[in-house]
């Protein structure tokens, strides 16, 4: 739904789907164990770096959006922490975090501006039952978590559908005055395979 919306408006889109299960030719097809989470995170960060270095950064666009769903969002944040030069071109980071997915912080011991930039640039929809909301009942979460919005839903598909109009409105506001094909959007999400 989001990818088609972006393509229909002339965005240049890189849609990355990260499989939860990777099978090898010698595996029995009766059961495929979920890939090691750290290995998946590392591979996703590596792929994001490759795409940034070889495609996105080379483009003339200065309106770049990242959208991450589930664990893939955490991997995008890991990539951004290690590649601070991305901040110059990145206009908005949209994230969707389910109740079972950890929420990555964006804090640096050496860059005091980093968490402020992240708070201003991000919009993260967090599941209604995520542990973060219980932990921060009395005091709002700090800006190291980004600009958070509590979703009315826990199911990822329901969250994506419910927030579609709001997300596309945010992106429309960001692209005021742009030319078609000048706006790469990177969408990374987990898929069950």
Where do the PLM segments sit?
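Short, flexible/disordered secondary-structure transition segments
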Residues: 13, 59-62, 178-182
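Conserved beta-strand elements of beta-rich interaction domains across eukaryotes
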Residues: 20-21, 71, 99-101
């Amino acid at each position: 739904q989001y990818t088609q919306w972006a393509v229909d408006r002339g965005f240049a889109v890189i849609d990355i789907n990260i499989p939860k299960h990777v099978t090898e030719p010698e595996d029995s097809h009766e059961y495929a164990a979920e890939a090691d989470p750290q290995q998946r995170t590392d591979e996703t960060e590596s792929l994001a770096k490759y795409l940034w270095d070889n495609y996105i950064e080379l483009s003339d666009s200065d309106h770049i959006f990242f959208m991450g769903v589930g664990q893939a969002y955490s991997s995008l944040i890991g990539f951004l922490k290690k590649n601070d030069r991305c901040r110059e071109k990145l206009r908005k980071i949209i994230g969707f975090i389910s109740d079972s997915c950890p929420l990555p912080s964006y804090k640096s011991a050496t860059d005091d501006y980093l968490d402020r930039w992240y708070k201003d640039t991000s919009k993260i929809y967090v599941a209604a039952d995520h542990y973060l909301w219980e932990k921060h009942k009395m005091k709002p979460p700090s800006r190291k978590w980004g600009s958070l919005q509590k979703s009315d839903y826990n199911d990822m598909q329901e969250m994506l559908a419910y927030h579609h109009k709001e997300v596309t409105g945010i992106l429309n506001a960001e692209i005021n005055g742009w030319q078609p094909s000048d706006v790469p959007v990177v969408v990374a999400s987990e898929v069950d395979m």
